[in-house]
Each structure stands twice: as C-alpha cells, then as structure tokens.
C-alpha cells in the first residue's frame, strides 16, 4: 500500500473514530460524516485515475452528489432540532419519533 492510500485511509479512520467518540453534538457528527465522505471521494478518484478505469469516472461525482444531499438534510435537521429544543444534542433526536 502506497503512502498516499495510507494517508487517505487514515483520514477516513480518524473521521470514523471522531464520529464514534464525539456523538453528543449533531454538528460534530455531521462534520465527521463529511470528512468520511471526502476521504472516500479522494480515494475513489485516485484509484480510478491510477488504474485508468474510464468506465467508472462518473462514480466520484455521484458520491459527491450524495454527500451534498446528506449535508443538506443533516443541516436542515440541525436547524429544526436547534429551533425546537434550543440545543443540538444527538439525544434530542430520539424525541423526533412518530
């Protein structure tokens, strides 16, 4: 495994550990999810470029679109929770059940 792949994998791992450790605030969880998606995007782009696999050249863009949709939904949920309860704690999300 080259050093570049190792660094990208470590970025994903650090974001995953951050997501598992700092779960109290919704904003920190969203930032860790965005870090994971960004590292997946970079890993996918580098792999496709190194292997000259032109058939999958659209896959990183699709992943980026899904990451943008996830960020928009997460931020709208953050605004709704903070307006309703005054805080952005993840434990308030259990109160949103129907």
Curated annotation (Swiss-Prot):
One of its GO terms (molecular function) is NADH dehydrogenase (ubiquinone) activity. GO terms for cellular component: mitochondrial inner membrane; respiratory chain complex I. It is a multi-pass membrane protein. The chain crosses the membrane at residues 1-21, 29-49, 61-81. It is found in: Mitochondrion inner membrane. It comes from the Eukaryota. Its EC number is 7.1.1.2. The keyword Protein transport does not apply. Keywords: Electron transport, Membrane, Mitochondrion, Mitochondrion inner membrane, NAD, Respiratory chain, Translocase, Transmembrane, Transmembrane helix, Transport, Ubiquinone. It catalyses: a ubiquinone + NADH + 5 H(+)(in) = a ubiquinol + NAD(+) + 4 H(+)(out). InterPro entries: NADH_UbQ_OxRdtase_chain4L/K, NUOK/Mnh_C1-like. One of its GO terms (biological process) is ATP synthesis coupled electron transport. Pfam families: Oxidored_q2. Core subunit of respiratory chain NADH dehydrogenase (Complex I) which is composed of 45 different subunits. Core subunit of the mitochondrial membrane respiratory chain NADH dehydrogenase (Complex I) which catalyzes electron transfer from NADH through the respiratory chain, using ubiquinone as an electron acceptor. Part of the enzyme membrane arm which is embedded in the lipid bilayer and involved in proton translocation. Belongs to the complex I subunit 4L family. This is NADH-ubiquinone oxidoreductase chain 4L. It comes from Zalophus californianus (California sealion). The gene is MT-ND4L.
């Amino acid at each position: 495994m080259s050093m570049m792949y190792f660094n990208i994998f470590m970025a994903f791992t650090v974001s995953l550990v951050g997501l598992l450790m700092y779960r109290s605030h919704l904003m920190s969880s969203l930032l860790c999810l965005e870090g994971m998606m960004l590292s997946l995007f970079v890993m996918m782009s580098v792999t496709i470029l190194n292997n000259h696999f032109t058939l999958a050249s659209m896959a990183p863009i699709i992943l980026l679109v899904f990451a943008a949709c996830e960020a928009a939904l997460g931020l709208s949920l953050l605004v709704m929770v903070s307006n309703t309860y005054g805080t952005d704690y993840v434990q308030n999300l259990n109160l949103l059940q129907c």
